[in-house]
Swiss-Prot record:
UniProt entry keywords in alphabetical sequence: Ribonucleoprotein, Ribosomal protein, RNA-binding, rRNA-binding
Gene3D superfamilies tied to this protein: 6.10.160.10, Ribosomal protein L20 (1.10.1900.20)
Native species: Roseiflexus castenholzii (strain DSM 13941 / HLO8)
UniProt record similarity statement: Belongs to the bacterial ribosomal protein bL20 family.
The protein's name: Large ribosomal subunit protein bL20
One Pfam family, short name: Ribosomal_L20
A GO molecular-function descriptor: structural constituent of ribosome
NCBIfam families: rplT_bact (TIGR01032)
Summary of the function given for this chain in its UniProt record: Binds directly to 23S ribosomal RNA and is necessary for the in vitro assembly process of the 50S ribosomal subunit. It is not involved in the protein synthesizing functions of that subunit.
Keyword Iron in record: no
PROSITE patterns reported for this sequence: RIBOSOMAL_L20
Length: 117
């Protein structure tokens, strides 16, 4: 069996890794060992923060809905309870967008929720 020297594949792998580490400061973009650790950590941060982003946006939507609801004399929890009882199935993302872009329509939704509560 012929002897396989891995020089070509190692260079290919290192090149791919250093390409991923492009833009990092100092030796993190030049040294393979340091670049590997940095890229692995960056990928882990990306994985973690894709999940955290969902939490953060939900929190932001709730804050916006609560602020807009209080301008109409209603708390967030009472508004959500009223919407559920009224059978209005708008999610938090849509409600928050409505509160920011179309306050009049949001006001009408709040009125419907107030009638039920």
């Amino acid at each position: 069996m012929a002897r396989v020297k891995r020089g070509v594949m190692v260079r290919k792998r290192h090149k791919k890794l250093l390409e991923q580490a492009k833009g990092y400061r100092g030796s993190r973009s030049r040294r393979v060992k340091v670049a590997r650790e940095t890229v692995m950590k960056a990928l882990w941060y990306a994985y973690r923060d894709r999940r955290n982003r969902k939490r953060d946006f939900r929190r932001l939507w709730i804050i916006r809905i609560n602020a807009a609801a209080r301008m109409h004399g209603m708390s967030y929890s009472r508004l959500m309870n009223g919407l559920k009882r009224a059978g209005i199935e708008l999610d938090r993302k849509v409600l928050a967008d409505m509160a920011v872009r179309d306050p009049a329509a949001f006001g009408r939704v709040v009125e419907q929720a107030q009638q039920v509560v």
